[in-house]
Amino acid sequence: MASLSSTILSRSPAARRRITPASAKLHRPECFATSAWMGSSSKNLSLSYQLNHKKISVATVDAPQVHDHDGTTVHQGHDAVKNIEDPIEYIRTLLRTTGDGRISVSPYDTAWVAMIKDVEGRDGPQFPSSLEWIVQNQLEDGSWGDQKLFCVYDRLVNTIACVVALRSWNVHAHKVKRGVTYIKENVDKLMEGNEEHMTCGFEVVFPALLQKAKSLGIEDLPYDSPAVQEVYHVREQKLKRIPLEIMHKIPTSLLFSLEGLENLDWDKLLKLQSADGSFLTSPSSTAFAFMQTKDEKCYQFIKNTIDTFNGGAPHTYPVDVFGRLWAIDRLQRLGISRFFEPEIADCLSHIHKFWTDKGVFSGRESEFCDIDDTSMGMRLMRMHGYDVDPNVLRNFKQKDGKFSCYGGQMIESPSPIYNLYRASQLRFPGEEILEDAKRFAYDFLKEKLANNQILDKWVISKHLPDEIKLGLEMPWLATLPRVEAKYYIQYYAGSGDVWIGKTLYRMPEISNDTYHDLAKTDFKRCQAKHQFEWLYMQEWYESCGIEEFGISRKDLLLSYFLATASIFELERTNERIAWAKSQIIAKMITSFFNKETTSEEDKRALLNELGNINGLNDTNGAGREGGAGSIALATLTQFLEGFDRYTRHQLKNAWSVWLTQLQHGEADDAELLTNTLNICAGHIAFREEILAHNEYKALSNLTSKICRQLSFIQSEKEMGVEGEIAAKSSIKNKELEEDMQMLVKLVLEKYGGIDRNIKKAFLAVAKTYYYRAYHAADTIDTHMFKVLFEPVA
């Protein structure tokens, strides 16, 4: 098929660099004050916009050109020209070699491994490489812990553990002394620390290590300081609540911190050991268990772990489930997942292999599962067509109706509940557990935001509150891919995000600056092309006299934005332009049909003229002279001329059906749009029987029904304040919700006889209708600016 993008852009004066100042202005909605300077002789086209009187620079349009693989001339911003293949290849390699997951070493866990005595009875450590790791990794201030981010809980628990390990073997007394000094000077900071950032089990393991230090004769530690006494008090209160009988029977989170507990029945606990020999993937807990039991499986887990990390031990291992799930999530939200589809498929296959009816944990084959990993896994697998039973979430629903990350959780944190909220939105009909989850999660998160209690116990992320706030304001059905990507590029901190376990830790599969750099580069490249296409769309608007039909430039911008925010890829110009033009041409013809002066004879004449266009032969210039009807037909004819013969034939048939419907007062814009997208994408080329397939017809009928309801709601919204109130009520209509759930089910499930890419077009179109009905006009204006014009920082 000849490239429509090549045809339309080569005809454009913008492409030929003969742009007049009048036709080249990037017209913005009335809410923006716009100024542009575009001269045909300028080498660098400078554009700027003022939003609320604040000057904002805009990605340049007149920039170096590169040629896309389809032959289209693509404008690139200067910063976006740099090669993206290297970061893509780096990320592909990262995903392909994930293995058990990449994670930073924990001094705390390494110290517990270093404390293990030689199994042959010699006077020395069984794992001297772990002791050496401690020696080599003391920080300049005498502490151990995350060097880039200070967290008092992390620094103190790491430092006391390393001090105890060194003293256990009476080595490096000067390092022990420096560590003790650090603890003395910083222990009072515990009184000021954020409770939400307390490392896992700190109140249990820190006192246990102090007792161990005292038994080793380490003097000068602040054993009796008020801060330490407060930790002891919290420990006593927690231990009173620990159901020791239950923890010996079923896997609980307490298996993660056995080294801080007393009076344990090891015969019972060994029955709860994971298949890999660990206790809930924790090297420190497993090291303590080995000290008490000399269990061979514990030993093998510890040895395998330190061999992997050159003597060090992370706070948890493996992290194969956690690493893969969050990597996919980050790549999707950043808008760059399309570069890694085979790798993502492999990652999800790995997750599916270890999925259970209890859910999943951060590491595979764990009997203990949590709501965070389970929610993320359920959502991502469902999005990719896996059959996942949402009733797995019942494992985390308490008797009072609340959901918890895991049983016995003391402080519920925002991030796991936010992932529950996100998962709950991919609901199929009849899935009441997801309705319960959505209601609970929404209320929980709203309350956290209202009370400014958004600090998280699992991750330190600067923009987490912004992310959650936006997620509540913009649910999945009312989110368009490029809008989500633009915001997430703004919020994603890359390596700046730090995770909280027993210690602070980092994971390159999740928090990676290369992800961020690639996302920004890709967005700039796409945005530059979108701006170039917008220039062409404005010229088309002028040359076709579209304004005469009561269609404003803002209407044109909205149509182009909806298309671009949904299908943004560089190579999909054909579909974007066809989407935007089809919406505008349909408005033109509808305007002509609705005029009081338009007779039935005029309507039939237009339909007959369309019939004179033979899709398998050259068009005959129908309708190039005359009034509004002729102008509308000429615009449609010109649109069809941009395609090869067979595509033109298919599109003409789609428009003929739509015009016949319009003549009878029941035009189906959504059907026209989805058919146009699938035709232009080549999904049904030479396979017209797909249009008659039962599944295709079911999708088409359901999408049309949904879009008609949403169009009515949109009309209500435009009637002022009362209309907006009515629209908010209407969009929560039970029938509409159930129809959307059914559409999501039909599109996402792998079952059926038609390609998923064909089905995705129906959901993409329906989501744009939902988006318009859901959001206020000012919000949409903001999104248009961010996606099309605001440069990536």
From Swiss-Prot:
<keyword id="KW-0809">Transit peptide</keyword>
<dbReference type="InterPro" id="IPR008949">
    <property type="entry name" value="Isoprenoid_synthase_dom_sf"/>
</dbReference>
<feature type="binding site">
    <location>
        <position position="370"/>
    </location>
    <ligand>
        <name>Mg(2+)</name>
    </ligand>
</feature>
<dbReference type="InterPro" id="IPR036965">
    <property type="entry name" value="Terpene_synth_N_sf"/>
</dbReference>
<comment type="pathway">
    <text>Secondary metabolite biosynthesis; terpenoid biosynthesis.</text>
</comment>
<dbReference type="InterPro" id="IPR008930">
    <property type="entry name" value="Terpenoid_cyclase/PrenylTrfase"/>
</dbReference>
<dbReference type="Pfam" id="PF01397">
    <property type="entry name" value="Terpene_synth"/>
</dbReference>
<feature type="binding site">
    <location>
        <position position="238"/>
    </location>
    <ligand>
        <name>substrate</name>
    </ligand>
</feature>
<dbReference type="GO" id="GO:0010333">
    <property type="term" value="F:terpene synthase activity"/>
</dbReference>
<feature type="short sequence motif" description="DXDD motif">
    <location>
        <begin position="370"/>
        <end position="373"/>
    </location>
</feature>
<comment type="function">
    <text>Involved in tanshinone biosynthesis in hairy roots. Catalyzes the conversion of geranylgeranyl diphosphate (GGPP) to copalyl diphosphate (CPP).</text>
</comment>
<keyword id="KW-0479">Metal-binding</keyword>
<dbReference type="GO" id="GO:0050559">
    <property type="term" value="F:copalyl diphosphate synthase activity"/>
</dbReference>
<comment type="similarity">
    <text>Belongs to the terpene synthase family.</text>
</comment>
<dbReference type="InterPro" id="IPR050148">
    <property type="entry name" value="Terpene_synthase-like"/>
</dbReference>
<keyword id="KW-0934">Plastid</keyword>
<protein>
    <recommendedName>
        <fullName>Copalyl diphosphate synthase CPS1, chloroplastic</fullName>
        <ecNumber>5.5.1.12</ecNumber>
    </recommendedName>
</protein>
<dbReference type="GO" id="GO:0009686">
    <property type="term" value="P:gibberellin biosynthetic process"/>
</dbReference>
<keyword id="KW-0413">Isomerase</keyword>
<feature type="binding site">
    <location>
        <position position="457"/>
    </location>
    <ligand>
        <name>substrate</name>
    </ligand>
</feature>
<dbReference type="GO" id="GO:0009507">
    <property type="term" value="C:chloroplast"/>
</dbReference>
<feature type="transit peptide" description="Chloroplast">
    <location>
        <begin position="1"/>
        <end position="59"/>
    </location>
</feature>
<keyword id="KW-0460">Magnesium</keyword>
<dbReference type="InterPro" id="IPR001906">
    <property type="entry name" value="Terpene_synth_N"/>
</dbReference>
<dbReference type="GO" id="GO:0000287">
    <property type="term" value="F:magnesium ion binding"/>
</dbReference>
<feature type="binding site">
    <location>
        <position position="372"/>
    </location>
    <ligand>
        <name>Mg(2+)</name>
    </ligand>
</feature>
<keyword id="KW-0150">Chloroplast</keyword>
